[in-house]
């Protein structure tokens, strides 16, 4: 299925049904009183998270979504039927915004629902206006109009670990090696053109979800490259995994450049715990691999784990999975306590 993470859609809730003017028509009651019923309420438009959806592609086939109008009131004070609500189903992690950028809400948990356009209230029939001083009112109300809104649906993938790196750092190879995901892998930049999710199994009962996004390039925050438009997908992650190949001319400089691009997009990303995977170590001899963390330690902060790996040669992947799982677990436990 093609991946789509942003869609514009016009939503329209239903108008309220009109109230009616009617009179009782009963045998032996020549002057029956008012009996006009109220109109039904218009249907509302809701957005609901569906755990079976992973993309907004289904929404791209429509330009507008309508809920039903309410029915007019009837005789004998019958209230008109309410219009049927319209439910827009989206993947968990979807944010709904107005065209001005105002966030109406987000749906994170499966089944969570928010109202994005409320139906109009039904109008009053003449029976409502009867009083001691007005026994035969001829007044009724039209229904209130529904709402029409132009909305933007923005998907932020739900993952535990977000991969960060420049193009051709080996992120896609890593995801395919530690999970069941099958991203395109090739020896040229930008093989990842859309975000990829992979479930990583540490043990039978210990798992986490990893998200790979297109590689970032320098000055991505100025609109260059592909990665910046997908950075929203790592905003919800608990841990950031920086993938830096040892073939880089300056490992520390590459790490700082990635931090700069993240901060330019969303400063709060730098508050997340980080792990650095030094990739492509299969080009080194075994004795050189073991010394690598000590050799490059001065180029990275002391509190950031440095893990040499080779996804191609299956070196260091188990240790990477254990470290990531422990970091995710401790971070989420701390967040739960703070909440």
Curated annotation (Swiss-Prot):
Domain OBG-type G: 159-329
Domain of life of the native organism: Bacteria
SUPFAM superfamilies found in the cross-reference section: Obg GTP-binding protein N-terminal domain (SSF82051), P-loop containing nucleoside triphosphate hydrolases (SSF52540)
Main location: cytoplasm
Domain named Obg: residues: 1-158
Biological processes per GO annotation: ribosome biogenesis
EC number: 3.6.5.-
Disordered: annotated span: 66-86, 125-148
Positions bound to Mg(2+): 172, 192
GO molecular function: GTP binding; GTPase activity; magnesium ion binding
Subunit structure: Monomer.
Protein name (record): GTPase Obg
Species this protein is from: Salinibacter ruber (strain DSM 13855 / M31)
């Amino acid at each position: 299925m093609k991946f789509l993470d942003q869609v514009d859609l016009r939503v329209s809730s239903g108008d309220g049904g009109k109230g009616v003017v009617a009179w009782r028509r009963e045998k032996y009651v020549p002057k029956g009183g008012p009996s006009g019923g109220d109109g039904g309420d218009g249907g509302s438009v809701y957005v609901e998270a569906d755990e079976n959806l992973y993309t907004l592609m289904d929404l791209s086939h429509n330009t507008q979504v309508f809920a039903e109008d309410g029915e007019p009131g009837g005789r004998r004070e019958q209230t008109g039927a309410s219009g049927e609500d319209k439910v827009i189903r989206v993947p968990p992690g979807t944010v709904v915004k107005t065209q001005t950028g105002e966030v109406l809400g987000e749906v994170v948990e499966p089944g969570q629902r928010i109202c994005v356009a409320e139906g109009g209230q039904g109008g009053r029939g003449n029976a409502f206006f009867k009083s001691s001083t007005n026994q035969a009112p001829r007044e009724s109300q039209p229904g209130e109009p529904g709402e029409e809104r132009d909305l933007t649906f923005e998907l932020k993938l739900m993952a535990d670990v977000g991969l960060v790196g420049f193009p051709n750092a080996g992120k896609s190879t890593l995801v395919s090696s530690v999970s069941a995901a099958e991203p395109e892998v090739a020896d040229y930049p930008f093989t990842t053109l859309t975000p990829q999710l992979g479930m990583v199994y540490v043990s039978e009962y210990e798992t986490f979800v990893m998200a790979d996004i297109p590689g970032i390039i320098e000055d991505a925050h100025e609109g260059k490259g592909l990665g910046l438009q997908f950075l929203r997908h790592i905003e919800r992650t608990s841990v950031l995994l920086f993938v830096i190949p040892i073939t880089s001319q300056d490992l520390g400089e590459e790490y700082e450049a990635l931090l700069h691009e993240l901060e330019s997009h969303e400063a709060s990303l730098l508050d997340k715990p980080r792990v650095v995977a030094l990739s492509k170590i299969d080009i080194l001899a075994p004795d050189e691999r073991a010394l690598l963390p000590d050799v490059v330690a001065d180029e990275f902060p002391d509190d950031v784990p440095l893990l040499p790996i080779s996804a191609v040669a299956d070196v260091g992947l188990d240790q990477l999975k254990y470290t990531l799982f422990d970091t995710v677990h401790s971070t989420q436990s701390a967040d739960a306590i703070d909440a």
